[in-house]
């Protein structure tokens, strides 16, 4: 009422450092960005993905080959600078885990950048969000926001016992849940695997009636769509692939050191947080480093003189694979997970 921001704790934090638009923060960020694009009249080409970067004869990034995924038409986009902002890799489903990511999260930017000559950092590290929905199957892997635990929900095993502090760092929390379900055999059988309870009714025991609807309405709606009232019933959760710690190497300007004029922003960047991160810190990838990449790419574009376009780096990459004795039938970038084509 007095205009003070509501803040809460996140996993691993010693201070309240999380502020949210209820539990619609991601949607609010997307709405604001889309409004800005529309208001400024920035052209957007829907259903069209980059399938190869284009370099010029001097080895600078100079555009991309695009694929219209509706018509199959291929287009060439010329550019003085290029920004990769393709997000994560959860839809690769590493080690068979579910994911909270959108369907386009197939590490395409990493593939394109690496093939063009950019270096990768920490590509072997991914963050599992401790609480992905484990039941019902229709929302398997969907994010159950950290805010649920911040408001007081506890993680409980099949014996009804709290087995860990609810706001440990994400790696510790995810490992604890997996251990409870495997090594200790204290998970709950969901019909498609094991999970643990997240005691959501505790939120209203602590905060009073109406807290869930006021603070996490998206969670309430998601489960109510499947007949589960989280105000009265606990929910089943299990770790879900959430964030790609690794990515493409950049300098302080957001540009890849090995490929001039190629910039990276967002989750496709590697090394900003090292091999792990706290909740909320991923926003630095876009708000701080994304803004820097955009500004620097614009300044550099103003002084870049276009040169002849080539795809020579693709032939060089194929030659390197052959020289290393690597044979593969893999097609990349994937654009969408394999099961979308079945």
Per-range role (PLM):
Residues 36-44, 54-59, 69-78, 136-137, ...:
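Solvent-exposed alpha-helices and their adjacent loops that cap or buttress functional pockets
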Residues 112, 118-229, 233, 296-302:
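An anion/pyrophosphate-binding glycine-rich loop and adjacent beta-alpha core
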Residues 81-138, 142, 280-296:
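Glycine-rich loop(s) and the adjacent beta-strand/alpha-helix scaffold that form part
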Residues 22-30, 75, 102-106, 144, ...:
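Generic structural signal for well-ordered, non-membrane alpha-helical segments
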Residues 51-61, 65-67, 215-269:
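A glycine-rich dinucleotide-binding beta-alpha-beta segment and adjacent secondary-structure elements
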Residues 1-8, 12-16, 56-57, 156-167, ...:
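Glycine- and aromatic-enriched mobile tails/lids
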């Amino acid at each position: 009422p007095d205009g003070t921001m509501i803040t809460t704790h996140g996993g691993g934090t010693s201070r309240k450092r999380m502020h949210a638009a209820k539990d619609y923060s991601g949607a609010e960020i997307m709405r604001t960005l889309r409004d800005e694009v529309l208001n400024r009249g920035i052209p957007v080409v829907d259903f069209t993905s980059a399938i190869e970067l284009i370099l010029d004869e001097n080895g600078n990034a100079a555009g991309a080959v695009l694929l219209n995924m509706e018509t199959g038409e291929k287009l060439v986009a010329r550019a003085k600078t290029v920004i990769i902002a393709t997000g994560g890799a959860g839809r690769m489903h590493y080690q068979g885990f579910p994911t909270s990511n959108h369907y386009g999260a197939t590490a395409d930017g990493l593939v394109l950048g690496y093939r063009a000559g950019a270096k990768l950092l920490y590509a072997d590290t991914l963050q599992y969000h401790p609480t992905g929905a484990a039941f019902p199957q229709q929302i398997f892997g969907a994010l159950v926001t950290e805010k649920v635990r911040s408001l007081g929900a506890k993680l409980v095993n099949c014996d009804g016992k709290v087995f860990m502090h609810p706001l440990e760092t994400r790696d510790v929390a995810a490992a604890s849940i997996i251990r409870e379900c495997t090594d200790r055999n204290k998970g709950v059988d969901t019909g498609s695997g094991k999970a643990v309870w997240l005691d959501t009714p505790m939120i209203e025991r602590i905060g009073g009636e109406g807290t869930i609807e006021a603070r996490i309405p998206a969670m309430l709606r998601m489960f109510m769509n499947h007949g589960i009232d989280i105000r009265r019933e606990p929910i089943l959760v299990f770790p879900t692939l959430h964030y790609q710690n690794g990515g493409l190497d950049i300098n302080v300007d957001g540009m890849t050191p090995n490929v001039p004029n190629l910039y990276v922003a967002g989750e496709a960047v590697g090394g900003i947080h090292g091999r792990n991160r706290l909740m909320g810190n991923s926003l630095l990838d876009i708000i701080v480093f994304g803004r820097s990449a955009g500004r620097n790419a614009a300044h550099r574009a103003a002084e870049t003189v276009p040169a002849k376009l080539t795809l020579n780096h693709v032939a060089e990459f194929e030659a390197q694979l052959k020289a290393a004795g690597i044979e593969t039938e893999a097609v990349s970038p994937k654009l969408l997970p394999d099961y979308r084509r079945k």
